[in-house]
């Protein structure tokens, strides 16, 4: 009621759905006035309605089927289809794109399987995921009860997905998928390091990496970051540039590892000497002083947002700084790896810039702190 009142206060219509005893197996009860009929009818005005939700298991299918029941009670011959990107039904089961989907849903324990219903109905091999295939007999029975007959013979029939036809560079898709699998792995192991939970997900991701024929060193950025960390004794970041080269950045007296990396990466894509000091001391020192003297920070080093602000200020009077700043767009889509878990501030800024971030699952200091 609190949430519904809040929505009403914002002028957002809200409808209630109720628990149905025996859902989803008691088809006769579900498709009745005591099942879907209890749910409040959502009135629509357009011929095509998109139903979206925050994530898996949040009620999209149940909402659609409930609406089908009400629409047919109102005499409207409504239908339902799902727009779902992954898995890609007409790519092989072991294609890295489909394996990457398993990595993305490792917390749900989703697995890609052959759609046995589609194979039986059409003698064609297609890929779907286990939850849809397992639930299809129930979904088909519900639709038969509502519509009189099911328009679909398989879970694949229910989907609209043209991704497989849109691939123009299969090698690029395979590489990007493998990178995504590795990123999912490091996100999971970092979560275990932070929270102490999620070991099962990590174990599944290890199996998924083996299935894809890769390991955690797939990105050259990882070995570059860890190697330089051994040489410098401090946190290091590394990034794979658009030209395939790898640039690193280490923690210094003025900049954190993420800030140092972003500056070196910008210099690289802008053709500026990496040894050149682009940001003036006059731009850095006031920010450091503000942090330590007035904002209570013990870390005088600039985070990435502060570094980019200092670079922006300097660019007003320096052509070189302006040139370096203009390289930001070229970093979108690059992969970065850090030898320690970086701060949420740095990670947020890098993600806003479109940079993919992975971290070794360890903190910079005392085993559980980052600065």
Predicted regions and their residues:
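Short HxH-centered metal-ligating active-site micro-motif
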Residues: 268-300
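A short, polar/charged loop-to-alpha-helix boundary motif
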Residues: 254-270
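Residue-level structural signal for beta-strand termini and adjacent loop
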Residues: 79, 251-253
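The conserved Walker
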Residues: 55-56
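Short, conserved beta-strand edge motifs with alternating hydrophobic and charged residues
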Residues: 236-240, 280-282
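Hydrophobic positions on the alpha1 helix immediately C-terminal to the Walker A/P-loop
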Residues: 63
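Flexible phosphate-sensing "switch/lid" loops adjacent to ATP/NTP-binding sites
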Residues: 1-52, 67-229, 234, 241-243, ...
């Amino acid at each position: 009621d609190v949430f519904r009142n809040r929505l009403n206060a914002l002028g957002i219509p809200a409808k209630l759905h109720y628990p149905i005893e025996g859902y989803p197996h008691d088809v006769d009860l579900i498709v009745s006035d005591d099942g879907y009929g209890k749910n409040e009818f959502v009135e629509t005005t357009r011929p095509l309605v998109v139903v979206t939700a925050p994530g898996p298991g949040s009620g999209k299918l149940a909402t659609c089927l409930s609406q089908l029941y009400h629409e047919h009670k109102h005499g409207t011959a409504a239908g339902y289809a799902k727009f779902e990107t992954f898995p890609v039904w007409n790519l092989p089961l072991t294609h890295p794109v489909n394996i990457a989907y398993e990595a993305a849903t490792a917390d749900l324990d989703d697995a890609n399987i052959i759609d046995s219903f589609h194979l039986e109905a059409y003698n064609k091999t297609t890929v779907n995921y286990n939850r849809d295939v397992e639930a299809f007999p129930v979904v088909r029975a519900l639709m038969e009860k509502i519509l009189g007959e099911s328009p679909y013979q398989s879970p694949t029939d229910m989907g609209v997905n043209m991704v497989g036809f849109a691939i123009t560079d299969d090698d690029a898709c395979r590489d990007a998928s493998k990178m995504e699998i590795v990123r999912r792995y490091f996100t999971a192991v970092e979560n275990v390091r932070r929270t102490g939970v999620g070991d099962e997900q990590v174990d599944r991701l290890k199996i998924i990496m083996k299935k894809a024929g890769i390991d955690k060193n797939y990105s050259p950025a990882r070995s570059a970051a860890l190697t330089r960390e051994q040489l410098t004794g401090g946190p290091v970041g590394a990034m794979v540039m658009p030209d395939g080269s790898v640039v690193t950045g280490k923690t210094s007296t003025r900049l954190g590892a993420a800030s140092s990396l972003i500056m070196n990466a910008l210099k690289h894509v802008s053709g500026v000497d990496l040894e050149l000091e682009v940001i003036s001391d006059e731009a850095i020192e006031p920010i450091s002083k503000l942090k330590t003297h007035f904002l209570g920070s013990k870390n005088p080093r600039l985070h990435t947002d502060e570094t980019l602000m200092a670079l922006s200020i300097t660019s007003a009077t320096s052509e070189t700084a302006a040139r370096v700043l203009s390289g930001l767009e070229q970093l979108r889509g690059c992969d970065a790896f850090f030898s320690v878990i970086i701060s949420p501030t740095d990670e947020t800024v890098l993600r806003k810039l479109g940079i993919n971030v992975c971290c070794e699952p360890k903190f910079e200091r005392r085993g559980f702190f980052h600065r």
